């Protein structure tokens, strides 16, 4: 991690700790006030506790063009993106995705789709082009192949996520051990799941000075809960399959209902967040993270779009090609989860739990 980034972050937090004008805005400032020095672990914890509401920038008397140049939202955004690379495993992949961003995500989706398409064409070419009145996905990609591919990828991704979040949690708790209480855990989960701090003191997020909007929070909700519904759909389908109830499932079945609702959320949420990003004051964000953000949002959107199209056209000739493209996009999304913007939700939830165990404990 860059020494200059840590030194600049420490300087800003020291100035803010002396001023304390913004102490009521969000959890960052009460947590900051408990510290007199700011090492790497402190800075990365505070950075992930920040929800980038932007209020402190416009309230700060030392913000640019003041010679101190205090722009805390941007500096914490830079530290956040550095924390993803710091804690991820294996570290080399984190650096690659951070540097390439959007290009890496889209290229990976295209390559995986092309490889799966070529494999299907070589081993079962007829299934790609013929109508499939039953909508049987396994006639295109055998059940064992699909389970093996995604089972292996899921195991790798889960291992990477667990290692990363464990590293963050362990380093964030470098001070004397804090007991994990049910009350603190419940408050942290509540704050994370409701996005309670994705606004300042109960008012909507700033998109620019004196410009407020609740949409950033709502689009986050659409994205997050859309993802959860799609995950629930896949989980229910896995249970059905284990019970011998094979896909495809009826439009009125639970997996399809959950997946459709989640898919709609994953169309509206990422599209809305992409628009919101372009409307926000550039002073609030780190330009270096644009590629990671946009890659994640694009993969979520394309996963949902291809999945919904596959549902509608599953008994048509296009089903085979659509299935391969959808699976390639989903696999690209999965592979990039531990190294992109997805982890910000996990690190922020961990930071909120720590905050509720310590500062509010």
List the predicted regions and their residue ranges.
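A generic, lipid-embedded transmembrane alpha helix
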Residues: 52-58, 302-304
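Iron-sulfur cluster-binding cysteine motifs and their immediate structural context
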Residues: 17-38, 44-45, 55-83
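Structured cytosolic domains appended to multi-pass membrane proteins
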Residues: 48-49
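Recognition helices and adjacent regulatory flanks at domain boundaries
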Residues: 1-3
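Local sequence-structure signature of Cys/Sec-based thiol-disulfide redox active-site neighborhoods
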Residues: 6-15
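Membrane-embedded alpha-helical bundles of multi-pass integral membrane proteins
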Residues: 77, 83-361
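Secretory-pathway extracellular proteins and peptide precursors enriched for disulfide-bonded cysteines
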Residues: 8, 41-42
């Amino acid at each position: 991690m860059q020494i200059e980034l840590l030194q600049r972050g420490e300087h800003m937090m020291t100035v803010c700790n002396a001023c304390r004008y913004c102490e009521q805005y969000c959890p960052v400032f009460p947590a900051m006030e408990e510290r007199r020095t700011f090492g790497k672990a402190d800075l990365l914890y505070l950075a992930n506790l920040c929800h980038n509401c932007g209020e402190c920038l416009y309230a700060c008397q030392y913000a640019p063009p003041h010679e101190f140049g205090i722009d805390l939202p941007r500096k914490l955004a830079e530290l956040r993106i550095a924390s993803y690379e710091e804690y991820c495993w294996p570290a080399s992949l984190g650096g690659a995705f951070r540097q390439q961003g959007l290009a890496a995500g889209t290229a990976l989706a295209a390559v995986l789709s092309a490889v799966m398409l070529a494999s299907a064409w070589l081993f079962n070419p007829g299934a790609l082009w013929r109508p499939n009145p039953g909508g049987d996905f396994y006639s295109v990609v055998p059940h064992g192949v699909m389970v093996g591919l995604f089972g292996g990828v899921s195991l790798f991704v889960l291992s990477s996520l667990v290692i990363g979040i464990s590293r963050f949690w362990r380093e964030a708790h470098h001070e004397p051990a804090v007991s994990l209480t049910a009350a603190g855990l419940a408050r942290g989960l509540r704050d994370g799941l409701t996005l309670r701090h994705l606004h300042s003191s109960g008012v909507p997020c700033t998109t620019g000075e004196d410009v407020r909007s609740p949409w950033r929070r709502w689009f986050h909700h659409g994205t997050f809960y859309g993802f959860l519904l799609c995950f629930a759909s896949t989980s229910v389908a896995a249970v059905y399959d284990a019970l011998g109830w094979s896909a495809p499932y009826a439009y009125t079945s639970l997996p399809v209902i959950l997946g459709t609702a989640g898919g709609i959320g994953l169309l509206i949420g990422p599209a809305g967040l992409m628009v919101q990003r372009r409307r926000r004051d550039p002073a609030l964000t780190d330009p270096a993270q644009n590629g990671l953000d946009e890659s994640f949002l694009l993969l979520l959107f394309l996963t949902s779009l291809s999945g919904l199209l596959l549902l509608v056209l599953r008994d048509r000739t296009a089903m085979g090609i659509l299935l391969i493209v959808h699976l390639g996009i989903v696999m690209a999304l999965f592979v990039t989860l531990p190294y992109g913007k997805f982890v910000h939700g996990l690190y922020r939830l961990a930071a909120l739990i720590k905050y509720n165990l310590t500062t509010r404990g």
